[in-house]
């Protein structure tokens, strides 16, 4: 089915002046505080998101169909032929690998980013909130696993060498970090969009489970959409050109490392969707509560 295009929205790659980008950082910072509330540094949490998670946990939804043992054998690394797994198990093993990749990156970046109270520049405050939002997403992912009866899923210890590599990446000059960081957010958004579309076919036989996973997913997706705009705002004209060139190799490298991906998604089409990303294709349920750069909105 073709995406529904809505007027008034433009490409994420739309040009922006330096002044527009400065104004949009101010706008985004206000949006973050309004949506997230107070940052809880020690807990790597945000007050409003903490309340939202508590509401989910107070209204428990659990599947009536236990996840097979093949999940436990394959969720960290694929041991079996992925074609032998049913689609629900395949989705869950992919989701774990995807989320753990995120967790490793944000855990290393957190140690390199100053707390809000010590941040000198606005972009440092924005980045700290951004990382706290990502940690909140990890809790929502865990809630998804609990919905499927997988209460013991954890992300495991952070490999020392991996932490060092991610930490070194976080210390690079902003102009070097901005394009790959932007593409990473764009890649995440395309994954969430595809997951949202496939829920009916995979868990439609349990409407309460389907609806709960969709609620959790869209809470993450709303932030991810705002992160795409935020990361776009870090880039000048050269950064935008570099980001466009990085989409293809980054998509290939990431999805090529997860065997489940090619069985669940049309990753080639996802890459094309990212290269042509347009806010007009986002559902109003997500778009209306997220944040969009002003230069990506047509008058």
Segments predicted by a language model, with ranges:
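Non-heme di-metal
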Residues: 1-299
